[in-house]
């Protein structure tokens, strides 16, 4: 049983959360615009700061909680209402394949992402894709209002097909078919 950590427990929901490296790949302008447009939402980032002293967003509803132990992330994920993948679209991000996508989905949480090619190719059936701050807000509102129908069922099904056990089983089948 996971318990919500103290440093996130008192943050006002809904909580839009991200965990991972906090670096130049994060679209801080997008996050600032989301925080400004929706002061009733809380945006939470977890992870090590990479090549920066502090996060550039200074809003009362923006919370940087620092680096956390990997084993504690499920406890934080439990507090998230929507998971974020707010990456800048640039040469740095065109070829990334964020491992957090299946991690978020394994937690059964809705995800909103900027248009990362690998996320679109592999997860657009369960991840909301948004190119602008307005779209990001709209997709997040849809996730929060549960206007997405059977999304939770589809998230679980997708997470199962992206687990290491499932992938290993599929690879074993392919190898067996070669013989």
Where does each model-flagged region fall?
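Short hydrophobic "strand-cap" motifs at the C-terminus of beta-strands
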Residues: 16-20, 46-47, 65, 92, ...
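Acidic, amphipathic alpha-helical patches
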Residues: 31, 70-73, 101, 136, ...
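Nucleotide-sugar-dependent
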Residues: 71, 75-76, 83-106, 113-123
């Amino acid at each position: 049983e996971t318990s919500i950590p103290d440093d996130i427990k008192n943050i006002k929901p809904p909580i839009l959360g991200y965990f991972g490296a906090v670096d130049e790949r994060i679209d801080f302008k997008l996050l600032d615009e989301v925080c400004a447009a929706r002061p009733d939402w809380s945006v939470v980032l977890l992870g090590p700061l990479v090549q920066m002293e502090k996060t550039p967003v200074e809003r009362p509803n923006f919370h940087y909680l620092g680096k956390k132990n990997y084993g504690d992330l499920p406890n934080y994920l439990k507090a998230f209402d929507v998971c974020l993948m707010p990456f800048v679209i640039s040469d740095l991000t065109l070829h990334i394949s964020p491992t957090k996508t299946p991690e978020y989905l394994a937690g059964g949480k809705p995800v909103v992402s900027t248009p990362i090619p690998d996320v679109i190719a592999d997860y657009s059936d369960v991840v909301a894709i948004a190119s602008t701050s307005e779209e990001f807000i709209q997709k997040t509102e849809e996730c929060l209002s549960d206007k997405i129908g059977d999304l939770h069922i589809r998230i679980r099904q997708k997470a199962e097909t992206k687990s290491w056990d499932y992938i290993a089983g599929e690879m074993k089948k392919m190898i067996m078919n070669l013989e």
